[in-house]
């Protein structure tokens, strides 16, 4: 099933926009409203599974926290394992970490060292692509463990914030269901 314009419009309409959140001048795209609609949530998962079902994916990685909500069901649909990437000190086994830049500071992500095997073909899934910093750090973690990452999938792409271009420079093809301007 290839996504139809009608299906994509349905998904777009299920995402509420909140003006001036989290601060003045921001139009926030609330993907949790899509989760509240079981038809929209199921459709978003079905479309991502359909796109990647013949891509030879061996693991799906989702970033904390909303990436878990989409990545885990996509992994189930593909019949592969799901690997969470989390903030520091949230994973119980041995981890490696990657630091990345935020607008005014830095943050860090971690992954279990045994979660990705050399040669794993990994799909990264998250709810939203903005600047691409979080996904870039996630890709670095996967590659440090020997995994191959060529694709990342998102529900929302804030297309004018440069995330897709940033990830393309890392050899990542980005796919999103719903584009929005990032203002």
From Swiss-Prot:
GO terms for cellular component: cytosol. It catalyses: AMP + diphosphate = 5-phospho-alpha-D-ribose 1-diphosphate + adenine. The keyword Protease does not apply. One of its GO terms (molecular function) is adenine phosphoribosyltransferase activity. Its main location: cytoplasm. GO terms for biological process: adenine salvage; AMP salvage; purine ribonucleoside salvage. Its EC number is 2.4.2.7. It is found in: Cytoplasm. Pathway: Purine metabolism; AMP biosynthesis via salvage pathway; AMP from adenine: step 1/1. Keywords: Cytoplasm, Glycosyltransferase, Purine salvage, Transferase. SUPFAM superfamilies: PRTase-like. It is an enzyme of class 2 (transferase). The keyword Glycosyltransferase applies. Homodimer. Catalyzes a salvage reaction resulting in the formation of AMP, that is energically less costly than de novo synthesis. Belongs to the purine/pyrimidine phosphoribosyltransferase family. This is Adenine phosphoribosyltransferase. It comes from Salmonella gallinarum (strain 287/91 / NCTC 13346). The lineage of its organism: Bacteria, Pseudomonadati, Pseudomonadota, Gammaproteobacteria, Enterobacterales.
């Amino acid at each position: 099933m290839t996504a139809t314009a009608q299906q994509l419009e349905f998904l777009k309409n299920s995402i509420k926009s909140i003006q001036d959140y989290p601060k003045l001048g921001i139009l926030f795209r609330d993907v949790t409203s899509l989760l509240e609609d079981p038809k929209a949530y199921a459709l978003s998962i079905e479309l991502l599974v359909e796109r990647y079902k013949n891509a030879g994916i061996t693991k799906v990685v989702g970033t904390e926290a909303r990436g878990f909500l989409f990545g885990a069901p996509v992994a189930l649909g593909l019949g592969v394992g799901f690997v969470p990437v989390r903030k520091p000190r949230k994973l119980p086994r041995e981890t490696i970490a990657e630091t990345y830049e935020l607008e005014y500071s830095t943050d860090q992500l971690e992954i279990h060292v045994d979660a990705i095997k050399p040669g794993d073909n990994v799909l990264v899934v998250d709810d939203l692509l903005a600047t691409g910093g979080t996904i870039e750090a996630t890709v670095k973690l996967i590659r440090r463990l020997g995994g191959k990452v060529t694709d990342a999938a998102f529900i929302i792409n804030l297309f004018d914030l440069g995330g897709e271009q940033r990830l393309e420079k890392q050899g990542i093809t980005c796919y999103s269901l719903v584009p929005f301007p990032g203002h």
